[in-house]
Amino acid sequence: MKIRIDIPHHPYDIQIEKGCMAQAGQWLRELWQPQKVVIVTDNHVASLYAEKVKLSLEDAGFQVAVFDFLEGEERKNLTTVQKVYEFLVKQGLTRSDGIVALGGGVVGDLAGFVASTYMRGIHFVQIPTSLTAQVDSSIGGKTGVNTPFAKNMVGTFAQPDGVLIDPLVLETLGKRELIEGMGEVIKYGLIEDPELWALLTGLNGSVESILEHAETLIEHSCQVKRKMVVEDELDNGIRLYLNFGHTIGHAIEATAGYGKVMHGEAVAMGMVQISKIAEEKGLMPAGITQSITEMCQKFGLPVDYENWEVDKLYQALTHDKKARGNTLKLVLVPELGSATIHPVSLEEMKDYLVK
């Protein structure tokens, strides 16, 4: 299946197909003329797929080198970026060459940032290998790295030339790594897609059920992401809806220490906490917090952060990228399949941190 991201200045396709990673070279040849390519990945993904993708690209006429770094959110920083820059220089990459981001969200965010800043921007594509990356982070052009102050604090908007999604690679994920991706899938059902929510309701929550329906879950999620990105590429309007659960979720990730709590886990806890307080304030319908909680728990996602410290979380929130002056644009769900923006002051945000 192809989904067109029809952004006027940089349209591209998302290709979703079981087994398509084996044809990565042919796919890329249709996008780029054979040239130098660097595959950026982490050491875990490299051990599974780097050689397979490298050979496919070489068969298509590309000159390929591989850069891998130690896996983990804690490696998504400017130190790693500098190492990639140095590798690109040693390989002689020019502005006519490109990067293949092969991995999960950490790899995609970091490789995209490198591509958008090296020589003021070179071509790149995404081949996401985690559920979170396949349904969310590989699509839409947000790139970035973490700082000690906040998640993704340094970054750019830079669209890839294409996204290649192979649902079969999810079978090599560990249980926790697969389940955390469901945090984003559940979010899509809540903010925009009641049909997706109904599908999730019908699943039993097992790993087997996720893998069996992976292609459909990915397609639904990508369609929602497509709509938001095409209408609001630079995150000034409806694309903000994608941040449901992320305001508190990012604060949890930052205070826990990057890599301790996985992104989808933090999003799940953020959605539950925001909904609980918003429901108490009459801003979200009665019972929706219970529905979100039960859905997250069914798939094995955490709904409560055990190291909850209001002062630390609040401090992290003050660095949130969605803040405008003293105001945060909080995303709420007034009804299933619909989202809205609710501006709150940073002071009011303390209410949403009360357990």
From Swiss-Prot:
<keyword id="KW-0170">Cobalt</keyword>
<comment type="pathway">
    <text>Metabolic intermediate biosynthesis; chorismate biosynthesis; chorismate from D-erythrose 4-phosphate and phosphoenolpyruvate: step 2/7.</text>
</comment>
<dbReference type="GO" id="GO:0046872">
    <property type="term" value="F:metal ion binding"/>
</dbReference>
<dbReference type="GO" id="GO:0005737">
    <property type="term" value="C:cytoplasm"/>
</dbReference>
<keyword id="KW-0479">Metal-binding</keyword>
<keyword id="KW-0028">Amino-acid biosynthesis</keyword>
<dbReference type="InterPro" id="IPR030960">
    <property type="entry name" value="DHQS/DOIS_N"/>
</dbReference>
<dbReference type="InterPro" id="IPR050071">
    <property type="entry name" value="Dehydroquinate_synthase"/>
</dbReference>
<dbReference type="InterPro" id="IPR016037">
    <property type="entry name" value="DHQ_synth_AroB"/>
</dbReference>
<feature type="binding site">
    <location>
        <begin position="71"/>
        <end position="76"/>
    </location>
    <ligand>
        <name>NAD(+)</name>
    </ligand>
</feature>
<feature type="binding site">
    <location>
        <position position="263"/>
    </location>
    <ligand>
        <name>Zn(2+)</name>
    </ligand>
</feature>
<feature type="binding site">
    <location>
        <position position="151"/>
    </location>
    <ligand>
        <name>NAD(+)</name>
    </ligand>
</feature>
<keyword id="KW-0520">NAD</keyword>
<dbReference type="GO" id="GO:0009423">
    <property type="term" value="P:chorismate biosynthetic process"/>
</dbReference>
<dbReference type="GO" id="GO:0008652">
    <property type="term" value="P:amino acid biosynthetic process"/>
</dbReference>
<protein>
    <recommendedName>
        <fullName>3-dehydroquinate synthase</fullName>
        <ecNumber>4.2.3.4</ecNumber>
    </recommendedName>
</protein>
<keyword id="KW-0862">Zinc</keyword>
<comment type="function">
    <text>Catalyzes the conversion of 3-deoxy-D-arabino-heptulosonate 7-phosphate (DAHP) to dehydroquinate (DHQ).</text>
</comment>
<dbReference type="InterPro" id="IPR030963">
    <property type="entry name" value="DHQ_synth_fam"/>
</dbReference>
<feature type="binding site">
    <location>
        <position position="142"/>
    </location>
    <ligand>
        <name>NAD(+)</name>
    </ligand>
</feature>
<dbReference type="Pfam" id="PF24621">
    <property type="entry name" value="DHQS_C"/>
</dbReference>
<dbReference type="GO" id="GO:0003856">
    <property type="term" value="F:3-dehydroquinate synthase activity"/>
</dbReference>
<comment type="similarity">
    <text>Belongs to the sugar phosphate cyclases superfamily. Dehydroquinate synthase family.</text>
</comment>
<keyword id="KW-0057">Aromatic amino acid biosynthesis</keyword>
<feature type="binding site">
    <location>
        <position position="246"/>
    </location>
    <ligand>
        <name>Zn(2+)</name>
    </ligand>
</feature>
<keyword id="KW-0963">Cytoplasm</keyword>
<feature type="binding site">
    <location>
        <begin position="105"/>
        <end position="109"/>
    </location>
    <ligand>
        <name>NAD(+)</name>
    </ligand>
</feature>
<dbReference type="GO" id="GO:0009073">
    <property type="term" value="P:aromatic amino acid family biosynthetic process"/>
</dbReference>
<keyword id="KW-0456">Lyase</keyword>
<keyword id="KW-0547">Nucleotide-binding</keyword>
<dbReference type="InterPro" id="IPR056179">
    <property type="entry name" value="DHQS_C"/>
</dbReference>
<dbReference type="Pfam" id="PF01761">
    <property type="entry name" value="DHQ_synthase"/>
</dbReference>
<feature type="binding site">
    <location>
        <begin position="129"/>
        <end position="130"/>
    </location>
    <ligand>
        <name>NAD(+)</name>
    </ligand>
</feature>
<feature type="binding site">
    <location>
        <position position="184"/>
    </location>
    <ligand>
        <name>Zn(2+)</name>
    </ligand>
</feature>
<dbReference type="GO" id="GO:0000166">
    <property type="term" value="F:nucleotide binding"/>
</dbReference>
